[in-house]
UniProtKB/Swiss-Prot annotation:
UniProt-recorded name of the protein: Deoxyuridine 5'-triphosphate nucleotidohydrolase
Coiled coil stretches, renumbered: none
A molecular-function term among this protein's GO annotations: metal ion binding
Role according to the record: Involved in nucleotide metabolism: produces dUMP, the immediate precursor of thymidine nucleotides and decreases the intracellular concentration of dUTP to avoid uracil incorporation into viral DNA.
Residues reported in the UniProt entry to bind substrate: 180-182
Necessary cofactors: Mg(2+)
Keyword annotations of the record: Hydrolase, Magnesium, Metal-binding, Nucleotide metabolism
Length: 298
């Protein structure tokens, strides 16, 4: 037994999670490279507003790694691709939006959730920049703020163009634009995209029945510098669909080869260490802790 565990620890880096009772059940095996869940009870998605569904999972990422929270079910329900920052200690929550004007009931077994790990770069910003550094220590996302007021009409798609070049250029890392969980929880979704060239084109959708106003200077989205290995370029797209199981909206996505381990089933680690840093100290106020939804907070 001890020899098997020793061999396991030499094979891959490990991410520990804790599962508490919820309407979701973990379906992936111990040490798999993805954490997968499925609903064990019906989930109701309301129209004209976002539904925030707790998953009953607490996850501790490794230093230098963050995670993506992806989900899929019926086509008339969309999900916010959630960025789980390394120091986020709160319960993972899924933000759902309904494309119809009626309640959607997702029966048990039809809402599938996947958590994937990836590596990212935390560049140092020198001088004035269109990006703001992460709010909390070790966060992955850099904030992009509006230089003008923006209004998104109810139940409408809106495309917003910014004549901006990404201030950080890297051969090995790609700037990826993600929506903020705070806005997603209010009903405004942003389609993930790569930031290329000198124009940033953002696609948004207001799922609510009211106009959403974004004041000048407010945080619109976040930029994460993902390693190129996670974003393979495969053409044609139909081939990419066969080669890669996971997608970040339209982009094929490859996860890091880590092992997700249920800390309550692992004899090597105590549950008391899940919310401590590597020195054994409790998480400080400078880190995210349980603030927000694991992304930019609400």
């Amino acid at each position: 037994m001890s020899r098997t565990l020793s061999m396991r620890r030499r094979q891959r880096l490990e991410m520990y999670y804790k599962k508490v009772p919820s309407v979701f059940t973990v379906t992936s095996n111990q040490e798999e490279s993805t954490l997968q869940l499925v609903n064990n009870k019906p989930v109701v998605i309301e129209p004209f507003r976002s539904s925030v569904v707790p998953l009953g999972v607490y996850l501790r990422c490794l230093p230098g790694y963050a995670c993506m929270l992806l989900a899929n079910t019926y086509r008339n329900v969309t999900f916010h691709p959630g960025l789980i920052d390394p120091t986020y200690m709160g319960e993972l929550k899924l933000i759902c939006n309904n494309r119809t004007d009626a309640y959607v009931v997702v029966p048990a077994g039809r809402l599938k959730v996947t958590v994937l790990a990836f590596t990212f770069l935390s560049p140092i910003l020198t001088g004035p920049s269109v990006l703001s550094p992460p709010q909390y220590t070790d966060d992955a996302g850099y904030d992009l703020c509006l230089d003008q007021l923006v209004m998104v009409l109810p139940l409408k798609a809106f495309t917003f163009q910014l004549a901006l070049t990404c201030p950080i250029q890297s051969k090995n890392f790609t700037p990826v634009v993600l929506g903020r969980s705070g806005l997603a929880a209010k009903g405004l979704s942003i389609t993930p995209c790569k930031w290329k060239g000198d124009v940033l084109r953002l696609s948004m959708f207001n799922h609510t029945s009211e106009t959403i106003i974004l004041p000048e200077g407010s945080r619109l989205c976040q930029v994460v510098f993902m390693h190129n290995d996670h974003l393979p370029t495969i053409k044609p797209r139909i081939l990419a669909a066969f080669l890669f199981q996971h997608r970040l909206m339209d982009m094929p996505f490859c996860q890091s080869r880590v092992s997700f381990i249920d800390i309550q089933k692992d004899p090597c680690t105590s549950t008391s260490t899940l919310f401590q840093d590597s020195t054994g100290n409790s998480i400080s106020d400078a880190t995210r802790g349980s603030k927000g939804l694991g992304s930019s907070g609400i």
